[in-house]
Amino acid sequence: MPIGYIITILIIGVCTFTALIRVTRFGILAFYLTMVINEIPHLAALLLVFSTVLALSEGDLHGLLGSVLLIVAGLEFVGLLELTRRATRARSVVASTAADHGVQISNDAAQSWIRPLVFPVPLRPGAVKRIGRLPYGDHPRQRLDVYRHRNGDLFGPILVYFHGDGYSSGSNRNEGRVLLHRLAVQGWTCISATYRLRPDAGFTDHLDEARTVLRWARDNSEIHGGDVTRIVMAGSSAGAHMTALTALAPPNSAEAVPRIAAAVCLYPWIGRYFGRGEDESQPSTPLALDPSTAPPIFIAHGDHDSWVPVEEARALYDHIRTGSPNTTWYVELPGAQHAFDALFSWRNAAVVEGIVAFLRPIGEGTELTDSYR
């Protein structure tokens, strides 16, 4: 009995089937089963083909059991083709949203198609340097990385990014790296920060840290670069929750916090903070804030997100666009799970190009480079 082959197709089969359907129960388990295979299904298909050819060459797939295993492998291959189709559709969805706003996204085939096909690992390009683990506070979690072009003469806008993971875990070196690298190549100063986690820190602590990082970006611009009049805040999941709250908060000159020029929310969670109810004195959901002073906002979410349902992003988009005088982009990605920005995948590359197009008015006047180097 080909035990190794059976284990291979069992793992691929469970992950593929779970990724194909929209899971509404056991969402966190579904996320861990599908996060990787959903972004690089072509590599899973390659593994499946290689394993099948190897099993055939060794004579392991004979008799009734062998026939059944081949049929199962064939069905899994078809499922992986469907996941690939959904992943590659992201580019047309992003391009359509951009066109609705009178903008075109980049047609760089090397970065949009070839790189995700052959090497989906989000390594930092040679043109970008990272200055790491800089403190913005006394706590060990109050650290940030700065990403800049190695040509120190470039003077672009500033992006401040916050990671997700439910305010309870996470790292600033797992998510958003493709976006950080992409903008840094274009001359932006990109800051990716960690923050204290619950239960040791609470809602007001997180917001205070977000404001502290924004002030740090302004106060250290002469050292690390960046135009303090063009600061963009971004985040994923819990980081997007923090970003949306900051973007929709009314201006408060007493806090001396730089006003952000735009916001980027990737697979945002928008609920009330843990343990809070409707009687909270300070709103912890962006849906309770007036969007009339909101800057331009970009929202992207997957319709197969099993950790944070896509309905949350739709609600945030509807809330903002009905009250904000500025543009609001919403990209709903077919088949996408939570944390789709962890790899340099077709889907993530498309979203990043959409963000670059969305931020183009803010980046005008910045000396740009044509591609990753």
Residue ranges: model-predicted function:
Residues P2-I28, M35-S51, R314, G323-R373:
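C-terminal catalytic histidine-bearing segment of alpha/beta-hydrolase fold enzymes
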Residues F155-G166:
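Short beta-strand element of the alpha/beta-hydrolase
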Residues T212-Q282:
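Primarily recognizes the serine-hydrolase "nucleophile elbow" in alpha/beta-hydrolase
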Residues F17, R25, L29-S57, L61, ...:
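N-terminal cap/lid segment of alpha/beta-hydrolase-fold proteins
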Residues T293, I299-H301, D305:
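Short beta-strand/loop motif that positions the catalytic acidic residue
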Residues R173-I191:
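Short amphipathic alpha-helix adjacent to the substrate-entry channel of hydrolases
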Residues G166-S169, N174, C190, W216:
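Serine-hydrolase catalytic-loop signature spanning alpha/beta hydrolases and amidase-signature enzymes
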Residues S306-A315:
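Conserved alpha/beta-hydrolase "acid-adjacent" motif
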